[in-house]
């Protein structure tokens, strides 16, 4: 048996080619995006991390008995969407995260969902998005009710979940797998559509800036060369990292993640 993130796969016998899915995690600084990403990849909870660190991680998953090569971009926007092309033209699906104990993060999630809706209109395609209320373990300090989350998700026609990165792994895994299912449905509808990968130096079709038409700061749809390169992460910063697991060795011992620089894992 060979083991990678996700379920173990047999080392012999014919294997169908894995579905490739790119998933971007969006949200305000402090909403718990990195904690959710690491929880999904390692079953562990992190208590400290660098909010300025942005990376893309690779995981081999099995969703509905189908192998999936999942790439997860843990974005590093601070308070509002910034330089959005790096994920809008890359991801097949999006997780928009807010913290149930932060009204500001909830308001920011509305901005991200609006951005995705505008991009869907611009590109004339459906963009799968899931709204995620994180830090359910902090429910006693709630500033956002579950009903408000349901209403916001309903407004944009997306799925809604409440979870906690520091509690059950299964709930976090379920959300990520639901994102894969949503992406898979859209890919099956238009299999020839391929997103622009971060490392490709290819210009996008010229369009008028969204800033001028919709007032979304720093989010434009011009060519990649027009983006403020000081704010956009370099290819080296937004590298694809494959992290292997020792999960097969022990069901009780969580795998060790060694390539997440800036994280403190417990």
UniProtKB/Swiss-Prot annotation:
Keyword Hydrolase: yes
Stretches that traverse the bilayer: none
GN (gene name): RASL12
A GO molecular function held by the record: G protein activity
Keywords linked to the UniProt accession: GTP-binding, Hydrolase, Nucleotide-binding
Alphabetized SUPFAM superfamilies for the sequence: P-loop containing nucleoside triphosphate hydrolases (SSF52540)
Name this protein carries in UniProt: Ras-like protein family member 12
Binding site for GTP: 27-34, 74-78, 134-137
InterPro entries in the record: P-loop_NTPase, Ras-related_GTPase, Small_GTP-bd, Small_GTPase
Source superkingdom: Eukaryota
GO CC, alphabetical: plasma membrane
Family assignment from sequence similarity: Belongs to the small GTPase superfamily. Ras family.
Organism: Homo sapiens
A Pfam family matched in the record: Ras
Enzyme Commission code: 3.6.5.2
Catalytic activity reported: GTP + H2O = GDP + phosphate + H(+)
Keyword Disulfide bond carried by entry: no
């Amino acid at each position: 048996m060979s083991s990678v993130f996700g379920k173990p796969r047999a080392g012999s016998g014919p294997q169908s080619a894995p579905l490739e899915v790119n998933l971007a995690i969006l949200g305000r600084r402090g909403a718990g995006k990195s904690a959710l990403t690491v929880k999904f990849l390692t079953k562990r909870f992190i208590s400290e991390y660098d909010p300025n660190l942005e990376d893309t991680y690779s995981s081999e998953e099995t969703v509905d008995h189908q192998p999936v090569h999942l790439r997860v971009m843990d974005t590093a926007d601070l308070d509002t969407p910034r330089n959005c092309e790096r994920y809008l033209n890359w991801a097949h699906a999006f997780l928009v995260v807010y913290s149930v104990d932060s009204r500001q993060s909830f308001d920011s999630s509305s901005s991200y969902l609006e951005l995705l809706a505008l991009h869907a209109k611009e590109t004339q395609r459906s963009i799968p998005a899931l709204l995620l209320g994180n830090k359910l373990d902090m429910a006693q300090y709630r500033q956002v009710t579950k009903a408000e989350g349901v209403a916001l998700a309903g407004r944009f026609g997306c799925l809604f979940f409440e979870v906690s990165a520091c509690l059950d792994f299964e709930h976090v895994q379920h959300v990520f797998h639901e994102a894969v299912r949503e992406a898979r449905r859209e890919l099956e509808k238009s299999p020839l559509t391929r997103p622009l990968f971060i490392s490709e130096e290819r210009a996008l079709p010229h369009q008028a800036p969204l800033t001028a038409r919709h007032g979304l700061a720093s989010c434009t749809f011009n060519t990649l060369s027009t983006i403020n390169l000081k704010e956009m992460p370099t290819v080296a910063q937004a590298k694809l990292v494959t992290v292997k697991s020792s999960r097969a060795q022990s069901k009780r011992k969580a795998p060790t993640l060694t390539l997440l620089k800036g994280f403190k894992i417990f």
